Amino acid sequence: MINRQLSRLLLCSILGSTTLISGCALVRKDSAPHQQLKPEQIKLADDIHLASSGWPQAQWWKQLNDPQLDALIQRTLSGSHTLAEAKLREEKAQSQADLLDAGSQLQVAALGMLNRQRVSANGFLSPYAMDAPALGMDGPYYTEATVGLFAGLDLDLWGVHRSAVTAAIGAHNAALAETAAVELSLTTGVAQLYYSMQASYQMLDLLEQTRDVIDYAVKAHQSKVAHGLEAQVPFHGARAQILAVDKQIAAVKGQITETRESLRALIGAGASDMPEIKPVALPRVQTGIPATLSYELLARRPDLQAMRWYVQASLDQVDSARALFYPSFDIKAFFGLDSIHLDTLFKKTSRQFNFIPGLKLPLFDGGRLNANLEGTRAASNMMIERYNQSVLNAVRDVAVNGTRLQTLNDEREMQAERVEATRFTQRAAEAAYQRGLTSRLQATEARLPVLAEEMSLLMLDSRRVIQSIQLMKSLGSGYQAAPVVEKK
């Protein structure tokens, strides 16, 4: 007897093992994941030589010591609709991860049901259609009642749901990094617009000084014409100059208005609550990039962090797609009361218990699982290639912005010498006028070349400030990867 039972148990074990092995669908084609760029490949070309400096600090704008800029950025971070949208994407990604995680947990539900029915005299339950109280049948009408608890659990032995949850958590981490990228874009955008506006204020001041000089020349030539001391050609030439300057002044004023409106939209200000922006001097620019990039650039660029998390999530999705080829197991159970008579529903004899283990074997699916795996793998490899290109683009941004800033610094040094040279000429003209060697008009007009060179210097300074902010942005502007969100 015992040997027979052991034989049956052995036979069941062999059949069960054979069923599990044969129950796995065949993976016809699955390519290897594409390679990601190695950190040692993340470096600048050998012929790019820039001053060495540390990484930007968090809240980098505070180092500029500009209260107006501080207030604008704080208002942007607290009231930007773009940033609010990014934070809502965080919440959406979190809820998606929670939803998938909840689906892999034990599910328990209370069940209550009433079923008023008439039993067919010709069906499978035809005996219950009789009206025979002695036999416990008072058909053909019955009111069946069921109350109890229903539970279900997917055992997820191969990690179908587990990998899907991990992928969703990766997408949530990516959303966190994307929010940081939005903050970075907003802060640098506000700073660039703010200093563009400050440069326009200074340009307007230089143009108005230029206009004053030319206006004096117009009046001087007009007086000479009125006294018959010279022809009208110099007078009309000066008039043409002043009209050209007026045109430039109008253009700069329009540029200030456009910049202000762009800034208004970025900080989320309304038509009547835009803060007044007073003129201040442009800040001094610090030139330089870190000595090495490598891992640090990956960790300090929020867009690269987001891409890295999307790559990891795509690999987890591939794992989930592969796990679908294996048998799945689940357990369902019911415990409660069931009776075809309401008056006996809550009696001890109405208790019912069901225990239903389930097994699903993916034998024939018409290629659905392979197509799903192939598509998921292709999407993952696409994400890896996009990530690799993003890393290369990030290195390019650092190299290009750093080189441009260094070039602007060199140009600024030469332009500063030109300004000093024209100032020397102006001082010489002033000295000659003081000694009575030249007229006051000539001494005054000697100021025009100085103003022209100062405008060129101002444009270089403005471009340097904007470029330095762009370089900080390409270096992450003080971003540090946030702590990883893990499964609760």
Swiss-Prot record:
GO terms for cellular component: cell outer membrane. Its main location: membrane. Pfam families: OEP. It is a lipid-anchor. InterPro entries: OMF, OMP_efflux, RND_efflux_OM_lipoprot_NodT. GO terms for molecular function: efflux transmembrane transporter activity. Residues 1-23 form the signal peptide. A lipid is attached at residue 24 (S-diacylglycerol cysteine). PANTHER family: MULTIDRUG RESISTANCE OUTER MEMBRANE PROTEIN MDTP-RELATED (PTHR30203:SF20), OUTER MEMBRANE CATION EFFLUX PROTEIN (PTHR30203). This is Multidrug resistance outer membrane protein MdtP. It comes from Escherichia coli O157:H7. The lineage of its organism: Bacteria, Pseudomonadati, Pseudomonadota, Gammaproteobacteria, Enterobacterales.
